Swiss-Prot record:
One GO term (biological process): transport of virus in host, cell to cell
Top-level taxonomy: Viruses, Riboviria, Orthornavirae, Kitrinoviricota, Tolucaviricetes
Protein known as: Protein p31
Similarity comment text for this entry: In the N-terminal section; belongs to the carmovirus double gene block protein 1 family.
Note: Readthrough of the terminator UGA occurs at position 69.
Length: 279
């Protein structure tokens, strides 16, 4: 069920009581998180009966990327707050976020989010098929699905602990920080195009630059995704993951702008705000 098909109850309380959906909004930026269907407990195929899997069907952030006060839209932040509110324990992110092709001001998860309780429930081996079926997602493949098939290693779930005392559950990053040139090359090769949140995605940056954000800034996508090193460190650490603090300006001479802080499927990354070699 998508947000466009759901009639919103008049209040957050009513929505939680009636559908188990949590809504968070920020008046200053007119942001609305719709249809986080934490909702029903569903038995995972192949798992013991007492082990339940909670599915969040779809996450849609309307209007633009300014979801939090830092001007950083990271769906994992949103999901983490919902998981924490419902005391659901750890969860795994099985998909990436992408830009709305029409407006450039939306990010969503095109596949299911599996929220695991504190049992030993395992993620199904055939995540691409089984999770979509359990979550009731459409069978039509998105660009994210195609890229996942071609490069499944890029989408391996990254366990995130919401309890700082359980930091040992957070695996170390498999790569060193500041891999922007490498991933820009992947963007150039069309592996992550249209749902990656890099500014260096070919064909996206120039188009989005022409669309003012709701605060009247001409380059809304770029501005809304940039944050300072200290801010990134604080935000990332608040979710139980040690952020990378490599001084990118010293590593990459061409880096002269604020850096981008966001969630990549392999772990937290702080990357230069642009890749001029592709612009």
């Amino acid at each position: 069920m998508s947000s466009s098909q759901t009639q919103s109850p008049p209040t957050d309380v009513a929505r939680r009581q009636q559908t188990g959906t949590a809504v968070r909004s920020e008046d200053n930026h007119r942001n609305q998180l719709e249809n986080i269907a934490v909702g029903k407990l569903t038995k995972s195929e192949g798992a013991p009966a007492q082990q339940n899997v909670i599915i969040a069907k779809e996450v849609v952030i309307n209007n633009h990327f300014n979801f939090n006060x830092a001007g950083v839209c990271v769906c994992r932040f949103v999901l983490a707050s919902v998981v924490k509110e419902f005391n659901l324990g750890d969860f795994d992110l099985l998909d990436s976020v992408h830009l709305d092709e029409d407006t450039g001001h939306r990010c969503r998860l095109s596949r299911a989010i599996g929220v695991l309780d504190r049992s030993d429930t395992k993620i199904p081996k055939d995540r691409h098929t089984q999770w979509r079926q359990v979550a009731g997602l459409p069978e039509v493949e998105s660009s994210a699905d195609v890229a996942w098939k071609q490069n499944p290693e890029l989408f391996e779930p990254t366990r995130l602990s919401l309890d700082p005392t359980r930091s040992e559950t957070v695996p170390p990053l498999r790569e060193q920080p500041a891999p922007c040139p490498k991933f820009c090359l992947q963007c150039q090769q069309q592996l992550l195009t249209r749902f990656s949140r890099f500014q260096c995605v070919q064909g996206l940056t120039s188009r989005l630059e022409r669309r003012p954000d709701t605060l009247g800034r001409p380059n809304g996508w770029q501005h809304n995704h940039r944050c300072g090193i200290q801010l990134c460190s604080t935000l990332c650490a608040s979710l139980g993951r040690h952020s990378q603090q490599t001084p990118l300006a010293d590593t990459f001479p061409w880096h002269s702008s604020p850096i981008t802080c966001y969630q990549y499927p392999l772990g937290w990354r702080m990357l230069p705000g642009s890749c001029p070699q592709l612009q």
